[in-house]
UniProtKB/Swiss-Prot annotation:
It is found in: Secreted. Expressed by the venom gland. GO terms for cellular component: extracellular region. Has the structural arrangement of an alpha-helix connected to antiparallel beta-sheets by disulfide bonds (CS-alpha/beta). It comes from Isometrus vittatus. SUPFAM superfamilies: Scorpion toxin-like (SSF57095). Disulfide bonds join 16-37, 22-42, 26-44, 38-64. This is Toxin Isom2. Keywords: Disulfide bond, Ion channel impairing toxin, Neurotoxin, Secreted, Toxin, Voltage-gated sodium channel impairing toxin.
Amino acid sequence: KKNGYAVDSSGKAPECLLSNYCNNECTKVHYADKGYCCLLSCYCFGLSDDKKVLDISDTRKKYCDYTIIN
């Protein structure tokens, strides 16, 4: 399993202002374990390895992996 910004068929990650919205997007649409809003896009945790994710810098990935809101 992996973490990242899950993308839709058009290659875009859902934009967000609320983490609650992202948790629903990530768990119900992308079947991840959980999700939250990181830097204005939905960041998902526990995505299956075959899911497409946005190509982002290591710095941004580390920031979002580290900034988990429980």
